[in-house]
A protein has these predicted regions:
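Positively charged n-region of N-terminal signal peptides that target proteins for export
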Residues: 1-4
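Hydrophobic h-region of N-terminal signal peptides that target proteins for export
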Residues: 8-17
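Structured extracytoplasmic
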Residues: 17-149, 156-161, 169-179, 186-193, ...
Length: 225
């Protein structure tokens, strides 16, 4: 997950013809510049995540709410706030996803959109939630649970990644396998952060399961403050 990256399913989106002024090298360079500006400005944050597991064999959806704290010095930490209808297997499946959350520094290096991690192709333009985006095809250069084989939607104006959709390039765990994932990002207080994540997994002993994650209540520690 991506949360960093992990986690779903929406219908595929057809890309329009590639605009004449689009250049893949320029797009990737501007993505990197925007990433570096955010990395240099953001020293930590706290937030809330609500994980929901749906499975046809369960009488109720399992919901687990976490408080997330991230800092450059200590990485990312989760604290369980509440849970509902969390039977043993469902709880184990969700805690496995949380435990698989990558170390922030490792995710920065191994999961970001750059030529060290991916081969790219510019598919064209699309409108996503009212915003013009470039659509990039993502082909991971190696098997990694931090990489996605699929597509990325990049905002034409800000060069921020608004959506990543596809399948993880490597199994997250024995229990979860390789989920089909979709993660949306939004501007929060000047920083582009995950806002919604959904994944379809085939969980051992539970069967096909859909997991959604809703991100909220971000509070940021800006560097130098």
């Amino acid at each position: 997950m991506r949360t960093g990256l992990l986690l779903l399913l929406t219908a595929g989106v057809a890309a329009a013809a590639v605009p004449s002024d689009a250049n893949l090298d320029t797009i990737l360079a501007k993505i990197q510049q925007r990433y570096e500006r955010q990395r240099d400005a953001l020293c930590g944050y706290t937030g809330t995540r609500v994980y929901t597991l749906h499975n046809s064999h369960l009488s109720h959806d399992t919901v687990m709410k976490y408080r997330v704290t991230m800092s450059r010095s200590s990485g990312k930490h989760f604290k369980l706030i509440s849970e509902q209808h969390a039977g043993f297997l469902a709880r184990h499946a969700l805690t496995t996803l949380v435990d698989a959350e990558p170390d922030s520094r490792k995710q920065e290096q191994q999961g970001r959109l750059d030529r060290a991690n991916y081969k790219f192709a510019l598919l064209g333009e699309d409108v996503l939630n009212g915003h013009r985006c470039y659509v990039l095809h993502l082909s991971p250069r190696r098997q990694s649970k931090y990489l996605v084989s699929g597509k990325a939607w990049v905002d034409v104006e800000s060069y921020a990644v608004r959506r990543i959709k596809g399948q993880l390039a490597k199994s997250v765990s024995f229990w979860v396998g390789k989920p089909e994932v979709e993660e949306d990002f939004a501007n929060s207080g000047g920083f582009w952060m995950p806002s919604y994540n959904s994944s379809l997994s085939h969980v051992k002993l539970v069967g096909e399961a859909t997991v959604t994650i809703r991100f909220s209540n971000y509070r940021f520690q800006r560097c130098g403050q």
